Structure formats: C-alpha cells, structure tokens
C-alpha cells in the first residue's frame, strides 16, 4: 500500500500549514508507515493518509512524485 505522509521538517518550531511538506512511502499498514518515517527522520509528522488507486494515480501526475525508501 502507498501512503502519503504530511510533515513539518522542524520539530522545534510550531507547525504552520503553509510549511507542510509530504512524502510517499510503501508500507503494509498506516502504523508501519508512521514508524518508518519516525525512526528514519526528525520530522514532525502531522498525518498519514493511505492512497487508494484513484488518489495514487492523481498523485503520480505530479512531476515531483517519488516513493521514499529508507
């Protein structure tokens, strides 16, 4: 399954919506995706969203789409 993880790059600053970034990751569950990002980054994770087929197809249209691997 593919997940979109919304995060703030700096844990020390107050989250600001305009600074939210995202990455895409393959995992077996939402919990696994969350743990993978938590253990491999210093990001302040805001939300983890599972992408269905239509949402994934839409996200792939973005030229910046890239699956993150750790």
From Swiss-Prot:
Gene3D superfamilies reported in the protein's UniProt record: RNAP, epsilon subunit-like (3.10.20.730)
Catalysed conversion reaction: RNA(n) + a ribonucleoside 5'-triphosphate = RNA(n+1) + diphosphate
InterPro entries linked to this entry: RpoY (IPR009907)
GO BP term, example: DNA-templated transcription
Key words, A-Z: DNA-directed RNA polymerase, Nucleotidyltransferase, Transcription, Transferase
A GO cellular component entry from the record: DNA-directed RNA polymerase complex
A single MF term (Gene Ontology): DNA-directed RNA polymerase activity
Keyword Zinc carried by entry: no
Enzyme Commission number(s) of this protein: 2.7.7.6
Subunit note: RNAP is composed of a core of 2 alpha, a beta and a beta' subunit. The core is associated with a delta subunit, and at least one of epsilon or omega. When a sigma factor is associated with the core the holoenzyme is formed, which can initiate transcription.
Family the entry assigns: Belongs to the RNA polymerase subunit epsilon family.
Biological role stated in the UniProt entry: A non-essential component of RNA polymerase (RNAP).
Protein name as it appears in the record: DNA-directed RNA polymerase subunit epsilon
Organism for this UniProt entry: Limosilactobacillus reuteri (strain DSM 20016) (Lactobacillus reuteri)
The encoding gene: rpoY
